[in-house]
Curated annotation (Swiss-Prot):
UniProt keyword annotations, A-Z: ATP-binding, Chaperone, Metal-binding, Nucleotide-binding, Zinc
Cysteine disulfide links: none
Lineage per the UniProt record: Bacteria, Pseudomonadati, Pseudomonadota, Gammaproteobacteria, Lysobacterales
PANTHER family per record: ATP-DEPENDENT CLP PROTEASE ATP-BINDING SUBUNIT CLPX-LIKE, MITOCHONDRIAL, ATP-DEPENDENT CLP PROTEASE ATP-BINDING SUBUNIT CLPX-LIKE, MITOCHONDRIAL-RELATED
One Gene Ontology biological process: proteolysis involved in protein catabolic process
Residues where Zn(2+) binds: C18, C21, C40, C43
All copies of domain ClpX-type ZB, residue ranges: 6-59
GO MF terms held by the record: ATP binding; ATP hydrolysis activity; ATP-dependent protein folding chaperone; protein dimerization activity; unfolded protein binding; zinc ion binding
Encoding gene, per UniProt annotation: clpX
Protein name listed in UniProt: ATP-dependent Clp protease ATP-binding subunit ClpX
PROSITE patterns recorded: CLPX_ZB
GO annotations of cellular component type: HslUV protease complex
Length: 426
């Protein structure tokens, strides 16, 4: 309020005072009126300084708590076996992404662009697990979306805005937290367009979805209804800025290795791609995928604009038998450790022989399900035992060997020393 502004009662001679510092309107440049209170320009500046200092302290605290790439890699190593190249790429990309968010609070002419990530690897190689572990490490909201369920707006299926809706649900509709979250879009290869040439007809679940995802991934303000969908047109929409949300897209991209080999062959055999003689060689296929270029992804069926918004590409190798055996035993939440914990709750020790672990790995390789199929195999083998065990007494140990995995025998049950009256048949 200016100095010559009349009082609320209409008495122009009444002197007004700041409700916070007590200075009169004659001692300050400006006095702003509110409902029964006044605040001067000096108090407004002081409030701004306090808020600015708190933001800087919060930024410094976040920076100190942000794990370094080596620390990120160490945590990933605890949960994901192998895939060192992909883990290093992810560690650096995630670290740079959150450094970029912190840099927004500084007065700098250089604006850092967002680097979303594309994970390319066979099914069951650890793509989803990598994304989940990163989100858990960074303590940020995380959601998984299935690209095959997405369609263009106006068609039956999920709109791309539903992805942000799921992210909001994960953090109880805290918009600020959601704007720093991680979104993993699975099966991204399934929305590739049907041919390399632009479609002249509607492809609502392929190229159309890629077009719809462009702005969301790059950064836009999405209007999301709190209760989802468009069933409540009268409700107030939440405005979520996606420019600081990290998008990780993953897919198996079956056949991409052949596209890469064809490019290398047409180029006169330059590079390691020409060394691949058979697509059945798992190691060689992994090496071929490591040489993926944007043009290969475009030829596979992703539109150029979409590929351009996923500048960081990490490729995963197909898992061999030794890697699958390690996955069964080494990670913090390894499958065998989980089942041993379940049996411990019944006061029974569970033992997996080495030949059993190898048999499980071979079975998963034969089914071509990767690490994802390991749990199914172990679950089926132990199903009858887990059904009977709670009702039985005196069992101290259950042993699983190769013959059990091959369904040639039941798990071996080792009993404790029976009480005398039980042994006598009473």
């Amino acid at each position: 309020m200016s100095e010559d502004r009349p009082s609320r009662s209409g008495d122009g001679n009444k002197i007004l005072y700041c409700s916070f510092c007590g200075k009169s309107q004659r001692e300050v440049r400006k006095l702003i009126a509110g409902p029964s209170v006044f605040i001067c320009d000096e108090c407004v500046e002081l409030c701004n300084d306090i808020i600015r200092e708190e933001l800087e302290e919060k930024s410094q605290s976040a920076r100190s708590s942000l794990p370094k790439p080596k620390e990120i890699l160490e945590v990933l190593d605890q949960y994901v076996i192998g895939q060192q190249r992909a883990k290093r790429t992810l560690a650096v990309a995630v670290y740079n992404h959150y450094k970029r968010i912190e840099s927004r609070h500084k007065n700098d002419d250089i604006e850092l662009a967002k680097s979303n990530i594309l994970l390319v690897g066979p099914t069951g190689s650890g793509k989803t697990l990598l994304a989940e572990t990163l989100a858990r490490l960074l303590n940020v909201p995380f959601t998984i979306a299935d690209a095959t369920t997405l369609t263009e707006a106006g068609y039956v299926g999920e709109d791309v805005e539903n992805i942000i809706q799921k992210l909001l649900q994960k953090c109880d509709y805290d918009v600020e937290r959601a704007q720093h979250g991680i979104v993993y879009i699975d099966e991204i290869d399934k929305i590739s367009r049907k041919s390399e040439n632009p479609s002249i007809t509607r492809d609502v679940s392929g190229e159309g979805v890629q077009q719809a995802l462009l702005k969301l991934i790059e950064g836009t303000v999405a209007s999301v209804p709190p209760q989802g969908g468009r069933k409540h047109p009268q409700q107030e929409f939440l405005q979520v800025d996606t420019k600081n949300i990290l998008f990780i897209c993953g897919g198996a991209f079956a056949g991409l290795d052949k596209v890469i080999q064809q490019r290398c062959t047409e180029a006169g055999g330059i590079g390691f791609g020409v060394k691949v003689k058979s697509s059945e060689s798992k190691r060689d296929v992994g090496k071929v995928l490591a040489g993926v270029e944007p043009e290969d992804l475009i030829k596979f069926g992703l539109i150029p604009e979409f590929v351009g918004r996923l500048p960081v590409v990490a490729t995963l190798d197909e898992l061999d038998e030794s890697a699958l055996v390690k996955i069964l035993t080494e990670p913090k939440n390894a499958i065998t450790k989980q089942f041993k914990k379940l049996f411990e709750m019944e006061n029974v020790e569970l033992e997996f022989r080495q030949d059993a672990l190898s048999a499980v790995a071979r079975k998963a390789l034969k089914r071509k399900t990767g690490a994802r199929g390991l749990r199914t195999i172990v679950e089926l083998v132990l199903l009858d035992t887990m059904y009977e065990l709670p009702s039985q007494e005196g069992i101290s140990k259950v042993v699983v060997d190769e013959s059990v995995i091959e369904n040639k025998s039941e798990p071996y049950l080792i009993y404790q020393t029976m009480p005398a009256k039980v042994a006598s048949g009473e």
